[in-house]
């Protein structure tokens, strides 16, 4: 039994190293080895053995497809990581093969636990690798890379576009809303500045016009006042000159003439 396990897993390792084209289900040799290993876990006398093996084989080999198609960012995986996962799965099958047969329900529970652990490990490994492969720094990836969607083996060192996750729609929407609000705020600030500038310029022009009008008005009034003063002074000087001339010639003034006439 032990020699058979060694032989089967040796062929499994060789299949992993030679001609690996994709994730777990991408290698036909791997899927056949899983079927053989499952058959060694279930005795021949178990009822509906073939249906049980087919169901377990399908669920195990399709885990990679199940994980990869959840998100397009989960489609890339390094070949070395695929080999590690297969080695881990090999160890789990080997552990179950060394245990005593305890019935169909027990083996199904054990296989379910293996599938759940395999799915968790595969999801985490793919996420970690994709974050590195799709990083903005474009970190160099060593070794071949597998596209789990179409089982292609690539040597690309940096990945963009279809191989990387799109931006979260909510994040993009929030960014658009933020940019729109920033644009509105800038427009309001700019409009307020223009309006304030216009008000200040208009107020300044109005004040200049008012000062100019007031200055003109005051100058005009001042000229009128000066003219009135000059006119009054001229009349007084004229009357004073007449009085002096009458007194010198002996002619009575108008007031004296009236007084004499009255007498």
UniProtKB/Swiss-Prot annotation:
Stretch list, region Disordered: 241-263
Glycosylation sites: 98, 128
Extracellular side: 23-176
Keywords: Cell membrane, Cytoplasmic vesicle, Differentiation, Glycoprotein, Membrane, Signal, Spermatogenesis, Transmembrane, Transmembrane helix
Alphabetical list of Pfam families matching this protein: IZUMO
Membrane-protein topology: Single-pass type I membrane protein
TM region(s), chain numbering: 177-197
Tissue specificity of this protein: Sperm-specific (at protein level).
Primary site of residence: membrane
A biological process term (GO) from this entry: acrosome assembly
Range of residues in the leader sequence: 1-22
Subunit structure: Monomer and homodimer.
The protein's name: Izumo sperm-egg fusion protein 3
Species the sequence originates in: Mus musculus (Mouse)
Species lineage: Eukaryota, Metazoa, Chordata, Craniata, Vertebrata
Chain's gene name: Izumo3
């Amino acid at each position: 039994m032990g020699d058979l396990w060694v032989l089967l897993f040796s062929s499994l390792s060789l299949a992993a190293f030679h001609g690996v084209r994709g994730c777990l289900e991408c290698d036909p040799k791997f899927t056949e080895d899983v079927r053989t290993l499952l058959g060694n876990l279930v005795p021949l006398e178990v009822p509906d053995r073939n249906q049980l093996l087919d169901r377990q084989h399908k669920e195990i080999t399709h885990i990679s497809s199940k994980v990869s198609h959840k998100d397009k960012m989960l489609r890339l995986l390094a070949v070395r990581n695929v080999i590690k996962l297969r080695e881990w799965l090999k160890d789990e099958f080997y552990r179950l093969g060394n245990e005593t047969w305890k019935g169909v329900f027990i083996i199904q529970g054990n296989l379910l636990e293996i599938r759940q652990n395999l799915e968790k490990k595969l999801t985490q490994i793919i996420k970690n690798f994709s974050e590195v492969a799709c990083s903005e720094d474009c970190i160099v990836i060593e070794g071949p890379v597998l596209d789990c969607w179409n089982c292609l083996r690539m040597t690309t060192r940096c990945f963009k576009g279809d191989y990387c996750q799109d931006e979260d729609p909510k994040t993009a929407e929030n960014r658009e809303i933020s940019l729109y609000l920033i644009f509105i705020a800038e427009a309001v600030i700019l409009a307020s500045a223009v309006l304030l500038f216009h008000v200040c310029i208009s107020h300044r022009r109005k004040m200049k016009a008012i000062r100019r009008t007031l200055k003109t008005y005051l100058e005009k009034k001042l000229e009128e006042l000066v003219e009135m003063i000059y006119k009054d002074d001229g009349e007084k000087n004229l009357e004073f000159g007449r009085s002096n001339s009458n007194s010198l010639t002996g002619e009575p003034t108008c007031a004296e003439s009236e007084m004499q006439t009255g007498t």
